[in-house]
């Protein structure tokens, strides 16, 4: 019996604890394990496997999540390595390039001016080290709504692809980072309110806007005219690990939130709980 299912059996049968979600990083072994359960997702019809029937409670699924802080870092890393020329990636979407130099330009311009457009961004965000590349805060601040607004308002249209990417990732992170019942009130940010309704507009945004953004981006690369090799086209997009993780997590949070609210199991849902911080803190002692 696989170790995963042995753990589920102990929790379900011995401890009487329903297993609803499992979270992991995007390691190839984890993604391969999830794909092995494609026949157990009850024909979800999605591009990735994001749920599996719970063999110890067949009336329930176990939803599969990629760790959201990890996804933010890998998405930022994709943009960090994206530039025109000799680089590992040159991201492109519907006629616009998504380049790290666009964010660097904000930081450099702010350094030359007396008044900063984006006080939170600094060289620490753009000149990554072995330590800073692991910092979730730096990734989230670089791919923020503020960065998006600055690019759209003060910089040329050729930066707007990067701006839209930042906006999409920032909204995704907010939707998956609801931590308490009061944080939205303290920060005056409705995106951080607890989920209390299956018709929450954030769930609709994930399904109708965010997932469509990724799908349209990929399609624009496939349809891009020109003699590009398969490798060249892969460089225009996110890494496979990041793309599958975003799809899997978005689909999972939509369904599991509706499940928990509709079954009366929870009065509200805090999506920040769907990460592996607790495990990392425990084993990091």
Kindly label every feature range from the protein language model.
Residues 1-285:
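Non-catalytic regulatory appendages
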């Amino acid at each position: 019996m696989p170790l995963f299912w042995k753990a589920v059996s102990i929790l379900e049968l011995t401890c009487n604890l329903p297993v609803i979600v499992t979270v992991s990083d995007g390691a190839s072994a984890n993604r391969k394990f999830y794909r092995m359960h494609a026949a157990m997702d009850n024909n979800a019809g999605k591009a990735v496997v994001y749920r599996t029937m719970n063999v110890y409670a067949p009336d329930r699924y176990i939803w599969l999540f990629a760790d959201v802080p990890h996804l933010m870092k890998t998405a930022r890393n994709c943009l960090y390595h994206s530039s025109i020329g000799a680089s590992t990636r040159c991201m492109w979407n519907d006629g616009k390039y998504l380049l790290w130099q666009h964010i660097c330009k904000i930081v450099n311009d702010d350094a030359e001016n007396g008044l900063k457009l984006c006080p939170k961004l600094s060289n620490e965000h753009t000149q990554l080290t072995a330590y800073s590349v692991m910092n979730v805060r730096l990734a989230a601040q670089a791919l923020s709504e503020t960065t998006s607004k600055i690019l759209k308002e003060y910089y040329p249209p050729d930066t707007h692809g990067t701006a839209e990417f930042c906006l999409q990732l920032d909204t995704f992170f907010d939707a998956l980072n609801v931590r308490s019942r009061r944080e939205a009130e303290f920060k005056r940010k409705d995106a951080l309110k607890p989920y209390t309704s299956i018709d929450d507009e954030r769930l609709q945004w994930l399904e109708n806007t965010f997932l469509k953004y990724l799908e349209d981006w990929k399609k624009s690369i496939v349809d891009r005219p020109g003699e590009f090799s398969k490798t060249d086209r892969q460089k225009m997009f996110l890494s496979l690990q990041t793309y599958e993780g975003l799809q899997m997590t978005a689909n999972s949070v939509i369904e599991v939130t509706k499940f928990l609210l509709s079954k009366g199991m929870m009065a509200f849902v805090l999506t920040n709980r769907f990460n592996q911080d607790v495990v990392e803190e425990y084993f990091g002692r």
